[in-house]
Amino acid sequence: MSFASEMKNELTRIETDLCCSKAELAALIRMNGNLNIQNMQWVINVQSENAAIARRVYSLTKKIFGVDIELLVRKKMKLKKNNVYICRIKMKTKEILDELSILQDGQFVQHIDQSLIKEECCKRSYLRGAFLAGGSVNNPETSSYHLEIFSLYESHSEGLTEMMNGYGLNAKTLERKKGYISYLKEAEKISDFLSIIGGYQALLKFEDVRIVRDMRNSVNRLVNCETANLNKTIGAAMRQVENIRLIDEEIGIDELPERLREIARLRVQHQDISLKELGEMVSTGVISKSGVNHRLRKIDEIAEKLRNGEHIELKK
């Protein structure tokens, strides 16, 4: 079972008060429901590929409105051929749609009615219902961090985004081919969202994976940094040795001033040690890393002049 499916199964087991149940059911029916006419009466069909979500719709509708509901199972004929679960509501359909602010004055409402989310707990419940109906979240173990909720209507998606940002989640709205999404890309904000909608077990798993991933990434960055520094050090040492050998071939190392001559010989003899270690080997006393670097730069300048055929004056 995917991380998103496990999370949704957890969310469907949350106990809620009547006002919160209404808010959650409103999101579920608005986003997963459709209205048909059968035998001269309205019928609401709420469809999901997740059996736990279908049971949630059934139990919330029964709890709030006390009506009988048909549960149907269909087999998808395309792609994975998953089961499709349908909650069919034939009784009190107009009352239900009116009560959940999906239908007002005979017109379908595309935005989120504020009467549903007056209380803080109801806002969280509406977001939970919206995620159950149209939400997805990447597996934190294998993918980049991403959580989204799909809406058919722009005004509804913007309402979700605004509600999420009421909790400081930095959510964004984006148009997709067949609708709109409200999405989060930051791991910390996804964790906050899971907490807001009551997905505490999913939150713990997400945080565990996130900690391991962040630690692994930190180690990789450190290794890469150390490797880059090592390669830089090796490259500099090879260049220095090459320049010293050029000087030796052209004019002889013995022609260098004493302070450069000793460093040149030490570098050729100890090509794999650091500048700090070179400075500790000088016979006249320890010199600093910057002091060693200054002398090696002087040697580099002399070698470059020799390559260019320039005149060199060496002070003993």
Swiss-Prot record:
Q: What name goes with this protein?
A: Probable cell division protein WhiA
Q: Which GO terms describe its biological process?
A: cell division; regulation of sporulation
Q: What function does this protein fulfil?
A: Involved in cell division and chromosome segregation.
Q: Which GO terms describe its molecular function?
A: DNA binding
Which superkingdom heads the taxonomic lineage of this protein's source? Bacteria
- Which ranges of the sequence are annotated as binding DNA? 274-308
* Family according to the record: Belongs to the WhiA family.
**Record gene name:** whiA
Pfam families, per database record: HTH_WhiA, LAGLIDADG_WhiA, WhiA_N
Protein keywords: Cell cycle, Cell division, DNA-binding
